[in-house]
Structure formats: structure tokens, C-alpha cells
Curated annotation (Swiss-Prot):
It is an enzyme of class 6 (ligase). PROSITE patterns: AA_TRNA_LIGASE_II (PS50862). One of its GO terms (cellular component) is aminoacyl-tRNA synthetase multienzyme complex. This is Aspartate--tRNA(Asp/Asn) ligase. One of its GO terms (molecular function) is ATP binding. The keyword Coiled coil does not apply. The gene is aspS. Residues 198-201 are annotated as: Aspartate. It comes from Methanosarcina mazei (strain ATCC BAA-159 / DSM 3647 / Goe1 / Go1 / JCM 11833 / OCM 88) (Methanosarcina frisia). Its EC number is 6.1.1.23.
């Protein structure tokens, strides 16, 4: 058989509106299950889109074909040509009566893990054998939804006249200061894997690009070992000229609603596989000031939060529960953070410089995004760099862009994995990335 003839349809494409009863089709995929009942044999073929039942009745079919089907090894790769018989009780509403079964590759045995869902596997086992785990319907569904989310994000930004960019991931200096960087050797110099495209996004504002977005990897050398942290992640970043923090908050909340809408419209079967009943968040999202957040936490928790503290995990859950109980919504903003606990490029308020024009977009369970109006005045920016104990000389390439006409601008960054995780209610962020990198895992 020619490779071009190994498949005519995906399993989900065999439907009464596309295929006639009795029509010949060829499906290709993996042997999900074989059920030999003596006089009848069922082979469940699985591909990316679902499953199809191949039915062989001993008295009605060639003996060699029947015996070959009975001997099929689970997870072997096969191509099956046969006639479609629509049957409500069969998987996907039809069965395939085969004329030919081609075994393209025989699977080894025993399998590293079960793909049918009958035997649960721990996350580490699944990640160690990711090539098998990716064949599970639940795993595939997560990545179909992630794909649709990123497609919708690009669609949204193109609709609003954004330019997609790609900035360096190998840099000479820290983006936001601190030590959470992975050092690498760059010929005869020390360099780092970039922790954020922040500085480059701002340079693009000086370059007149006006509205940019980027979807790309970021690297954080933080020794977290939690269900919601990764050391390599995908960041969705935005920067907008002639805008303040309220403008980009509106952009962000509308993006979230847009993506949820697209996922609901285009990922019905994947959501069904995961048992997720997705609802579009209502906009505008509630905005709480940093001071209001302190009041909420201190009224509900024994462990008090003080002005100048960052928000810990307990605080995030406490405020998230409060918002959900009072509004029925999971997304909200925290605004007006203390200047000193935000990055040096966050713009302070002119009349109360101890507060910054910054925000975090929160989910009921965790932070999803952080953003701000940026400082565009060179002297103020340099002072803020120095006030955080950083050397302006290390940011020369960045500061130059502010000396020759930098417009007011604002932006944000959002982690793709956390966004998908909270959308689907996934327990561990590692389930939302194909090959996760954390402090313990560097392979596969």
C-alpha cells in the first residue's frame, strides 16, 4: 500500500453529513483495545480525533483477516480499510467492517503505562513516558485547547492592529534585576537565558511599533517545587504606546473573555473529554486596590498582611474566595501596588509616589498576569534603577531608547500555562506543557 493511501479520514470525520452508509474509508492510528469474544472480534482504533470500532464477525469475514485482528498488539500502528456502518451504540456512532488491516509497526510489550484509563498513573510516570501519555484522550484534549487558546490570542491581537514580535532569549543582563537567571557561556562571555521580553518590548515603543505582542519562552532559575511553577514557560506579552495601565487592563480582560468564547465554540469535544463546563468570564473584572486587599486578608486570616508585603499563596486564595463569594467570578485585578515591590519600570503616581500604576490580574487560585504603565521619562527611570540597587551601566542599551523620544506606554505579561491551567481546573501546571522543565526534570 502506498503511504498516500494509509488514511482517507480521521475517525471524527466519519459522519452522516460527510460519509455515506456503506462507503469505503481508510482509518489510521493505534490499537487502543482488542476484545475477542470468540465468534466476533472488536478492534478499537484510536487517532488524534477519537476512536472507531472495527468489527469482525468470524462467519462473515476471511479467516486470515479475523485471526490477524485477534493477534493485534495494543498500541501497534495500523491502517484499516473497510465499509462504514452507522450504529448508534458504537463509539462515534459507527463501526467499520474491514476488508484490509495493515500493521505498520508493532508495539513493544508490556507498555510503560496504560492508555485506556483503566489503570491510573502518577504524574511522574506519565511524564517519564510522555510519548505514551500524549496518546491519552485527556492529555490530547488539554493540548488541543492550549492550541486553540494561542490561536485565538493571535487572532485577537491581529484584529486590534498589533504586530507580532520575537525578541532575544539570550541576553547580557537581567531584565528585572535579581538572581533568578540561568547563566550560559556565549563564546567568551557570560550571558543569560532571558526571564522576560520586557526591556525589548519597551525599546519597540521607542521604535514606533505602537502595539506589539509576543508569544515565546521565558526562563526563571527559581527553586520552586510547586504545582504551579515552571522554570521554562511560555509568556504572552503585550506593550502599547500612548496608553496607561487602565487601557491595557481593559485589553487583557477582553482578551480573556475572547479566548474563553473561542474555546467554548471550537473545543466542544475536548472540553467534554475533560468534563469541563466552561463559562465566559464577565467583563469588566472587579478591581481591588492593594489597600483593600490588605483589609480583606486581615479580616479573614489570623496571619496578617502588612503594607509593603507581597501577596502570598494564602492571601491569593483568601482574596480569590472573597471575590468569588461576592461576585460569582474568578478573575479580578489588584491595582495600585506599592512602588517599591514592583519592577523599576513601573510608573509611580505623581501625587502619591509610594504607589505605582501597576496591576496583577488574578484568578481565584493564583496570579495570572502582571502589568503597569511604564516609566517613559529617562531621569526618573534611571533613579528607579538605582533605588533598587541596580547599576544603570548594565542597562545602557535600554536607557538609550528613552533619550530620543519615548512615548508614554503600558503593557503586561501573562503565563500561557497558568492561563490554561486555571481555565481547565488542572491540578498541576506540568499537565499544560508538553515537556515540562522544573528544578528536577530536564528530560524528556
Amino acid at each position: 500500500m502506498s503511504l498516500a493511501n494509509l488514511r482517507t479520514h480521521y475517525t471524527a470525520d466519519v459522519r452522516p453529513d460527510k460519509v455515506e452508509n456503506g462507503q469505503k474509508v481508510t482509518l489510521a492510528g493505534w490499537v487502543h483495545e482488542v476484545r475477542d469474544l470468540g465468534g466476533i472480534c472488536f478492534v478499537v482504533l484510536r487517532d488524534r480525533e477519537g476512536k472507531a470500532q472495527v468489527t469482525l464477525v468470524k462467519k462473515k469475514i476471511d479467516k486470515d483477516l479475523f485471526d490477524a485482528a485477534r493477534r493485534l498488539v495494543r498500541e501497534s500502528v495500523i491502517s484499516v480499510t473497510g465499509s462504514v456502518k452507522f450504529e448508534e451504540k458504537a463509539p462515534n456512532g459507527y463501526e467499520l467492517l474491514p476488508d484490509e488491516i495493515n500493521v505498520l509497526n508493532v508495539s513493544g510489550s508490556p507498555l510503560p503505562m496504560d492508555t485506556t484509563g483503566k489503570v491510573e498513573a502518577e504524574l511522574d510516570t506519565r511524564l517519564d513516558s510522555r510519548f505514551i501519555d500524549l496518546r491519552r484522550a485527556e492529555t490530547t484534549a488539554v493540548f488541543k485547547i492550549r492550541h486553540e487558546s494561542l490561536r485565538a490570542i493571535r487572532e485577537y491581537f491581529v484584529k486590534y492592529n498589533f504586530i507580532e514580535t520575537a525578541t532575544p532569549k539570550v541576553v547580557a543582563t537581567a531584565t528585572e534585576g535579581g538572581t533568578a537567571l540561568f547563566p550560559i557561556t556565549y563564546f567568551d562571555r557570560e550571558a543569560f537565558l532571558n526571564q522576560s521580553p520586557q526591556l525589548f518590548k519597551q525599546i519597540l515603543m521607542s521604535g514606533g511599533f505602537d502595539r506589539v505582542f509576543e508569544i515565546g519562552p521565558i526562563f526563571r532559575a527559581e527553586e520552586h517545587d510547586t504545582r504551579r511553577h515552571l522554570n521554562e514557560a511560555t509568556s504572552i506579552d503585550v506593550e502599547v504606546s500612548f496608553a496607561d495601565h487602565f487601557d491595557v487592563m481593559e485589553l487583557l480582560e477582553n482578551l480573556v473573555a475572547y479566548v474563553y468564547t473561542r474555546v467554548i465554540e471550537n473545543c466542544k469535544s475536548s472540553l467534554e473529554v475533560l468534563g469541563v463546563d466552561l463559562k465566559v468570564p464577565k467583563t469588566p473584572f472587579l478591581k481591588l486596590t492593594y489597600d483593600e486587599v490588605i483589609e480583606i486578608i486581615n479580616s479573614r486570616c489570623e496571619e496578617k498582611m502588612h503594607w509593603g508585603d507581597d501577596l502570598g499563596t494564602l492571601g491569593e486564595h483568601t482574596v480569590g474566595d472573597h471575590v468569588y463569594e461576592t461576585t460569582g467570578e474568578s478573575h479580578y485585578f489588584i491595582i495600585d501596588w506599592p512602588t517599591e515591590i514592583k519592577p523599576f519600570y513601573a510608573m509611580p503616581y505623581e501625587d502619591r509616589p509610594e504607589f505605582s500604576k501597576s496591576f496583577d490580574m488574578m484568578h481565584r487560585t493564583m496570579e495570572l498576569s502582571s502589568g503597569a504603565q511604564r516609566i517613559h521619562i529617562p531621569s526618573l527611570l534611571k533613579n528607579r534603577i538605582e533605588s533598587q540597587g541596580l547599576n544603570p551601566d548594565g542597562f545602557e542599551f535600554y536607557l538609550k531608547a528613552f533619550e530620543f523620544g519615548m512615548p508614554p506606554h503600558a503593557g503586561w505579561g501573562m503565563g500561557c500555562e497558568r492561563f490554561v491551567m486555571t481555565m481547565l481546573g488542572t491540578e498541576n501546571i506540568r499537565d499544560t506543557v508538553l515537556f515540562p522543565r522544573d528544578r528536577r526534570r530536564l528530560s524528556p
